[in-house]
Amino acid sequence: MICDGSESSGLVCGAFGLTAEPGAALIPVSRGAMGRVWRLDAGAERYAVKELFWESDEESVRTEAAFTAHLESAGIRLPGSLPGRGGRFLQELAPGQDGGWLRLYRWIDGVPVDLAGPGLAAAIGDLAGRLHALARPAGGPVDPWYDTVPAPATWDQLADAARGQGAGWAEAMAGRAGLLCDLADLVTRMPGDRLVTCHRDLHPDNVLVEASGELAVLDWDDAGPACPDRELAGLLMFWHGHDDGTADDAAVRRTLAAYRAGGGPGQLRDEQSFGMYLACRLNFLEAQASVALDPGAAPEHRAYASSEISDTLARLPAPSLISHLTSLAAATLG
C-alpha cells in the first residue's frame, strides 16, 4: 500500500525508473473496487499511478498495453501505459509495503464529463463508433463475468447473511431479489462470431473531457473480448438511462447516429443486447457483497463495498427501460 508521503513517491519512482526529484509527490485522485489512482508529480512531469488491490498478471497487462498503443496511434485519446523495472508494466510492492501492485501511465489533463453538456451525446457516440471500427479480433473466449450471472438463490442468501451481520443493505437486497432474477433472465452467452476487443466499461466515470473538447478514455484494465452490440447497449444505459426508469430519447438518437457515422457496426437486436451490462452489474453486486460480508477483509474495503452495494441496488434498470431503449435503437439504426 502506498500513501501520499515522500517515501511512497520515491518507491514509485524507483519501481518505474524515474528520477525522484526533490518535492516529488503523490496526490490521491480516486478509488474504485479494484484499486486506487494517484497523480505523481515529479518535477515538470506528471504521471498517473494505479495501485491495484488484487493481483493481476504481466501477460494480460502487456496485451492491454499493446491494444491501447494501437488505438492511440489511430488517434484515440487515452493514458498510455509505461513500463518499469525489467520492462515490466506491472510492479509488485514488497511485503513490507503491505503488498499490492502498481501500474504507471502518462497523465491526461481533463475534467469529468457533464452529461447535460451540448454535443456530448454525439461525441460519445462518435468515440464508441471509432473504438469499434478500430477494434482488433478477440484474443480468446469471453470472461464469464460478462455473460453469466449468479444463481437465482444468491440474492436471498446474501440478504440473509447481511441480516445476520446487521448490514444496512440487507433489506434492500431482499426487496430487489425478484428484479435481480428478472434481469438475470436477459443474460445470454455472447455469440462467438461477433467478438472483438472492447473496453467493456464505457461508463462516464471512465471518460474525461480535455481542454480541446476531445474525449479521453481511461481505465483499460478490463479490455477484452465482447460483442459491439452489447457494449453499445451498455453505453446507452450508462449515459442516457435515468434512475426513474426513463431515458433521454433525443440524446440516445444523437449517440446512435454519431456511432454509426463513426464506423460503429453494433446493432441492438433485442433485450438480450443488454446482457453484458446486466451481467457486470449483477456480478459486481455479488462480488461487493462477498467483500462486505468478509470479516477478514480490510475495513476500508468492507465500507467501500457496502456503499457500492447500496448504490447498485438503487440504480438497477427497470425491464421497461431496457425494452424502450431496444425499440428506440431499432427505430434509429434500422
Predicted ranges, named:
Residues 266-277:
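All-alpha amphipathic helical-bundle segments outside canonical DNA-binding/catalytic cores
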Residues 114-172, 195, 303:
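A cross-family kinase active-site recognition segment
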Residues 229-264, 278-296:
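Active-site activation/catalytic loop segments of kinase-like enzymes and analogous catalytic loops
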Residues 1-85, 210-212, 329-334:
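Conserved NTP-binding catalytic cores of kinases and kinase-like/nucleotidyltransferase enzymes
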Residues 5-16, 139-141, 153-200, 321-332:
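An alpha-helical support segment within catalytic cores of ATP-dependent transferases
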Residues 31-44, 48-49, 81, 184-230, ...:
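Active-site acidic catalytic loop and adjacent metal/ATP-binding pocket
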Residues 149, 161-164, 284-334:
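ATP/Mg2+ or Mg2+-diphosphate-binding catalytic cores
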Residues 42-140:
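ATP-binding pocket architecture of kinase catalytic cores
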